[in-house]
Structure formats: C-alpha cells, structure tokens
Amino acid sequence: MFQDNPLLAQLKQQLHSQTPRAEGVVKATEKGFGFLEVDAQKSYFIPPPQMKKVMHGDRIIAVIHSEKERESAEPEELVEPFLTRFVGKVQGKNDRLAIVPDHPLLKDAIPCRAARGLNHEFKEGDWAVAEMRRHPLKGDRSFYAELTQYITFGDDHFVPWWVTLARHNLEKEAPDGVATEMLDEGLVREDLTALDFVTIDSASTEDMDDALFAKALPDDKLQLIVAIADPTAWIAEGSKLDKAAKIRAFTNYLPGFNIPMLPRELSDDLCSLRANEVRPVLACRMTLSADGTIEDNIEFFAATIESKAKLVYDQVSDWLENTGDWQPESEAIAEQVRLLAQICQRRGEWRHNHALVFKDRPDYRFILGEKGEVLDIVAEPRRIANRIVEEAMIAANICAARVLRDKLGFGIYNVHMGFDPANADALAALLKTHGLHVDAEEVLTLDGFCKLRRELDAQPTGFLDSRIRRFQSFAEISTEPGPHFGLGLEAYATWTSPIRKYGDMINHRLLKAVIKGETATRPQDEITVQMAERRRLNRMAERDVGDWLYARFLKDKAGTDTRFAAEIVDISRGGMRVRLVDNGAIAFIPAPFLHAVRDELVCSQENGTVQIKGETVYKVTDVIDVTIAEVRMETRSIIARPVA
C-alpha cells in the first residue's frame, strides 16, 4: 500500500531537506570519539560508534542531531577520503592480513590483501604501500585495502629511507642510462685549461659542479670566472636521460646518501669538475668594481678547464683564519684563495648595503654507521669558505638573470614577492604595536621590503621577525623574470647546479642559445609546476628521514637529566615546539609541562607567547634548557620538558 506512494516520497524528501547538515573534516582522538571540524570556530562531536564509519582526516557531510542541548554529527556522505595511497606495517599472516597506516592518528588495522601479480608473501612487520578499496560511507560494510608494493622487512636498518621514499613515491636509485659521447652543439670552447681553477666543497662531495678563478685587474677591480659543469653537452633535449631528469627535477639529498637526478657516471664523473681532469664547462666572466658592484661587461661563453685543486671548506676556512695545519699545495693556489676571499668580502658588503644577506644558520650533518645507525649529529657552522662559494654563486646567478632577461625575456627564475598584499595593513598594524612604523604600500616594494628587513635584522632578538613570517608569500619558480625580495634582488635565475637541478639545465640551454645568437623557445609553465612539486616532496622526505633519525639518536636520552639548549620555534594552544640548538632536532613541550593549572596558562600562537598568571614567561626565539621526557618511536616524535 505504501509502495511507490508519491506522498510518502515527498515526505521523506521534505524530512531530508529539513535535517541540518554540515561539511567538514574528521578529527580523531585517542579516546575513540572524534570531532567534525567545520571551520576554525565550529566543530561537532562524533560519538565512538559513528567514528567506525570514518577515518581521521576524511572530508564528509554529516547529519547534525540535537539532543538535550548537545549537538552531535552522524556521518552521511564521503566528500574526500583522507587515505587513498599510503604506507603502513602489515599484521597477520598470508591468509588473514591487515595493515596499520604509518600515521600518528590512525591506529586501527585495516583488513587487506595483496594485489594480483604482487609476488611477495607478506608477513608480520613487513612495510608495504597500500591503496584503499572500500569505505563504509561508500556503501561498503567496512574499510578494506589492497597491498600494491612491498617496501622492506620490519627489522631492516634502512627502514627510515625506504619507507619515506615509498611514502612520497620518490625514486630509490640513480636513473639508468649512460651518455658516452659529447654532442656537437656548434659551440666554440675557449681553452682555459692553463688557468688555476679550484673547486671548494665538502670532503665527501663527488658531484662538483662549480669551479672558480679570480684575477686582480687595474683600478682595484677584480675579475671572477665561474665555470659550471656542462651536462647539456652530453644530454640532448628530449632524450631518455633528459626526460628522466625532467621528472626528478632535483637530486634528492637525504641524510646519509643522495639519489641523483642524472646517472652517477655523469653526476660523479664525466660532468664532475674533478681535479686534474679536463672538463667542458659553461662559464661566466664578470668584473667587480672596488665596492663589489658587478659591472655591465658580463660575458657567458663555453670553455674547457682543468681544476687544479679540490679544496675542502674547513681546511680553506682554517687557513684563512690562521688555524689548523693545512696549507695550499702551491703559491698559485694560495693566491687564488686570497683573491676569492677578497671577492667574497666585497660581494658580501655590496649585498649588505644594496640587497639582503641571510642570517647564518648552521647545517646539521648526520654521521651514520654501516647499518644506518646514528653515530653523531654535528652542527656545521657556515664559515668563510662556504661564504666564498655562496657569494660567487649568487653573483653568477644575478648575471644569468640579467642576461636571460635582457636577451630573451624569459628563463627559469626564482621569484619571491615579499609580503602578500592582502596582509600589508595587518603587517603594518602589528609592527606599529612593537614601535616600528612602516607604510603599508611601501613595504610591498623591493626597496621598502629591504628597508624593513634591515630594521628587523638590527633588532636585539629575532622575535619580531618570527611574528611577521606568516605574512610573507612563498618563493616560486617562474618562466617570467621577477624580483626576489628574500634576496633583495631585481631578478635571480640559477644555473650553477645543473648536475642536481633540472631548471639549471634549462637555463644552460637558453644561455647557450644566447652565446650562439640563436632564437630559443620559452620553457613550458608545466615544468615549473613539476619542479615546485618535486622540491616540496624532496623537502618532506628529508624532514621525515630526519625525524626518524633524531628519534633513534635521542631515544636513550629519554627520562634522563641530560640537558639541551633549545630555541622556541612555535607556540600553539597545545604547547611549544622547540629546536635543539646542538643537533637541530624538533621537540614538543605539551602545555601541562609548562604549568600545572590550565586556567592560569595562555599559549598564544597569534602573539607567539606563553603567559602564566598574566606574565609572559616564554616567547618564540627564546632559548631555554630542556630535558627529553619521552621519545615515541612509532610516531617519531620527541617530547621535552623545560628544566625547572
């Protein structure tokens, strides 16, 4: 009687349309219940039985029920699942398998089976890549996944590397292929093999892509020739090797080893500017005036060179600082080092006065044993030899940016627009509360940005600098010339690392077209998208492996009285994030460790401060002493507490 009853259907429709609904993201808790977060202000409670239908991070539409003043959400429709492809640890044996996703808030095992054609017998503890196949909100009875790739066994010492690379879907090894002979590019190469070129790198570096030569000129001027390895002399555009490099976009540098963009025969041998080996290069000859200005007679040309010495950063720095027992092998090499130090001094002063100079942060290096165990983590401060290379490279990249802009009007440029215009007024208001007066319009210009940065650098602490960081836009890769506010430069295009950056290879090809007087094709914008995405993935992979190794390294310090100096890098409602000064590890200090009475504690991300009873006790950039309370290996997180 009620079947196909139009009135009943209408009533159902009416009820459905009158029921309140909300779209948001599921946030799980460790207690079984969860929340539907609609926006920063509004969230709804999801009871434990309803949480069985969803997963942390799912974007869903839910029906909102109100009972006795309390609202709760009942998941109804899946908008976007949180998990699609993921990595995890396998449980059980071949006939009954499940996988636990490797994610801090996903604790439940998901039933699964191996995909057809995957020839591996999975066992307890194996790491695998899986893809979700079923979801309760899609009408399935339960969650279900398919194992699509075996990563490695549970006790493999190199789990941090293999799992991280699989998670981000990145290559594990160097590309195949070999380039046996140089291309005929129709370039005339200047023979500079008699000049005393030197390379300065870490002792372990094999892929040397830059060599330097300096010469004193009359009128207190200096000449610098920057010679860069020439992989495009071996790799034709559109060839198999070129396509592989285009996909990788960068060499991926992880703690302990790298995965090169080019085959190792090229990156570490044929293209590497090894000492006493003749190599083809793309070179830039520039003249620096007494105050460090790059004069207009910039010249790009093809050449052959023979590096006369592979110098090492620390040894060169020691010698220039009159310490250590290393000596340059000849007076000619010593003279090169002295001239390069002079160039560094001039260019550093020029950038300080006319552009911007980054504050020096140390590099942290993991020292690993045979089995991937962390023997030590050392902070390597940026010393004079590092700055010599950095100043030479920045100068060379400024030259390329100018030449490509003026001769072609395009290239692969690093562009940074400073502050987002939408934030200019809020930025000016924030600075005003700290006694700095800036014009909201002026700060959006390159000069205005540089002026503000210099004022911030002159502040006694980095606190204000950290406050305005959220107003800054991100650096981008563009085919269009544009300013780089972060460096304080009108234009910046890198070409000095073509062995490890595909964008630099593109700029090499464009510079060669300029040298030959040929027309060149503008690079496709898609390539900049691929490069930006790869840069993001490589950085995430480096961070993930680092987190794993830091957790391994600090595990035996948990619960001990060992003190670490730590800089506060971020404050949130839940506590503070700190960076250990000696080794670079990031640790979290939960709010209850800061003060026992929650009502007397205010942790403000907005202000970058922690107040107890109305008094500011901690602020971002403060350095405090901490001990390690706990290291959670399954989430690779380090929990610290302040030393009382």
From Swiss-Prot:
Regulation of activity: what does the record state? Stimulated by the presence of a monovalent cation. Acetylation leads to decreased substrate binding and decreased catalytic activity.
Q: Cite the Gene3D superfamilies for this sequence.
A: 2.40.50.640, Nucleic acid-binding proteins
Catalytic activity annotation? Exonucleolytic cleavage in the 3'- to 5'-direction to yield nucleoside 5'-phosphates
Where can this protein be found? Cytoplasm
**What GO molecular function terms would the record report?**
3'-5' exonuclease activity; exoribonuclease II activity; RNA binding
Instruction: PTM N6-acetyllysine: list the residues.
Output: 501
Entry-linked Pfam families: OB_RNB, RNB, S1
Q: What happens when the gene is disrupted?
A: In the presence of wild-type RNase PH (rph) 80-90% reduction in viability in stationary phase (96 hours of growth) at 31 and 42 degrees Celsius or when cells are rapidly starved at 42 degrees Celsius; if rph is also absent there is no visible phenotype under these 3 growth conditions. Its absence leads to extensive degradation of rRNA.
Q: Name one GO biological process term.
A: mRNA catabolic process
Cofactor(s) of this protein = Mg(2+)
* Sorted UniProt keywords: Acetylation, Cytoplasm, Exonuclease, Hydrolase, Nuclease, RNA-binding
Q: What is its main location?
A: cytoplasm
Temperature dependence of the activity comes to: Optimum temperature is 50 degrees Celsius.
A cellular component term, taken from the record's GO annotations: cytosol
How is this chain modified after translation?
Acetylated at Lys-501 by PatZ. Deacetylated by CobB.
How this protein's activity responds to pH is stated as: Optimum pH is 7.5-9.5.
The RNB domain covers which part of the protein?
189-516
Enzyme Commission number(s): 3.1.13.1
Q: Name the source's superkingdom.
A: Bacteria
Q: Which family does it belong to?
A: Belongs to the RNR ribonuclease family. RNase II subfamily.
Q: What is this protein called?
A: Exoribonuclease 2
Source organism per entry reads Escherichia coli (strain K12)
